[in-house]
């Protein structure tokens, strides 16, 4: 990790690692700094000195960190050429009992970090009132692969892909259970559709849509079965087709079909795989292949029940294949 620096106003210092856009920050009380005249951020004053490293917070970059009772006021901070505003509550605690984000806005261009070997997959926030937390994030127009779940005790988790395999950081050191991870996979699948259905998507929504689809697939690969793996590939294919990336759409569609042919999957999956292939070929401009795959999908859909057939036929009807 790269050296970050000191935060004189908070009496802390940090290390940083780039994650390809997001970054991971290791932060601690700076023993060489004067104690601040206020509570330190991230509830560090309440953390025992003997505590093991753990996930303590997350931040969202926004254009304007508007203060609220949950986030606290926005403080102006600076170090060297960098200046930023960040929400910090008077008690130093994070919003929503420690699982909601602080808000940060950089004055000028945000600093960039070299991309490290690890990649952030998703953030999972568990809270007794997920509706309130979800509404808070919606008001911020959240564009990130985040799963909000219900739970008696607030917990924060972050999933990473690393050269040494998957890693899950948590706020309580308990790891992730199968039920939580399956729910995350489903939440991220539905979050992807929310982005797909938006008529006002901008670039940051497109990036979040890709990240959410890939995160859903990543989690399903750990806790799902062949049908979930195939549909995860299918959704990734749809996302890239919508964004005009035919090559990546085709690669995911081919993996979807490969799973359908090699494993036991639900009856609708082969028809969905050929629908995805048809859409990818249409994006690539290969209309002959697109028609062939569309016809294969129609033939397979005939054997499905009415509900599944209607879904497949609706999807096939949205593929832009000219008459001929």
Question: What are the roles of these predicted feature ranges?
Answer:
Residues 179-187, 207, 227, 268:
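Residue signature of alpha-solenoid helical repeat architecture, marking inter-repeat boundaries
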Residues 193, 213-221, 254-262, 295-306:
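Amphipathic alpha-helical segments of tetratricopeptide repeats
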Residues 1, 10-12, 18-180:
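Glyoxalase I/VOC metalloenzyme domain signal
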Residues 186-187, 231, 272, 311:
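Residue register of alpha-helical TPR repeats
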């Amino acid at each position: 990790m790269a050296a970050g620096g000191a935060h004189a106003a908070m009496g802390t210092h940090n290390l940083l690692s780039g994650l390809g856009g997001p970054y991971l920050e290791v932060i601690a009380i700076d023993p060489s700094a004067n104690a601040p005249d206020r509570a330190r951020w991230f509830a560090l004053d309440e953390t025992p000195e003997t505590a093991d490293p753990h996930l303590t917070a997350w931040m969202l970059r926004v254009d304007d960190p508007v203060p609220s009772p949950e986030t606290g006021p926005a403080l102006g901070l600076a170090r060297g050429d960098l200046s930023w505003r960040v929400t910090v509550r008077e008690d130093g605690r994070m919003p929503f009992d420690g699982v909601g984000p602080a808000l940060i806005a950089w004055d000028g261009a945000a600093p960039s970090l070299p991309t490290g070997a690890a990649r952030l997959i998703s953030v999972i926030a568990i809270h007794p009132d997920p509706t309130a937390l979800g509404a808070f994030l919606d008001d911020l127009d959240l564009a990130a692969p985040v799963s909000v779940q219900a739970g008696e005790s607030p917990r924060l988790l972050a999933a990473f892909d690393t050269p040494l395999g998957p890693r899950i950081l948590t706020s309580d050191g308990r790891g992730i259970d199968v039920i939580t991870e399956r729910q995350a996979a489903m939440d991220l699948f539905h979050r992807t559709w929310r982005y797909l259905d938006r008529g006002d998507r901008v670039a940051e929504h497109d990036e979040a849509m890709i990240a959410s689809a890939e995160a859903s697939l990543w989690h399903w690969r750990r806790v799902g079965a062949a049908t979930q793996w195939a549909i995860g590939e299918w959704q990734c294919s749809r996302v890239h087709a919508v964004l005009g990336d035919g090559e990546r759409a085709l690669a995911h569609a081919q993996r979807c079909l490969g799973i359908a042919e090699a494993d036991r999957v639900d009856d609708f999956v082969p028809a969905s795989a050929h629908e995805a292939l048809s859409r990818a070929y249409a994006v690539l401009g290969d209309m002959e292949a697109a028609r062939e795959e569309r016809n294969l999908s129609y033939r397979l859909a005939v054997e499905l029940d009415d509900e599944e057939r209607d879904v497949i036929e609706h999807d096939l009807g949205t593929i832009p294949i000219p008459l001929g």
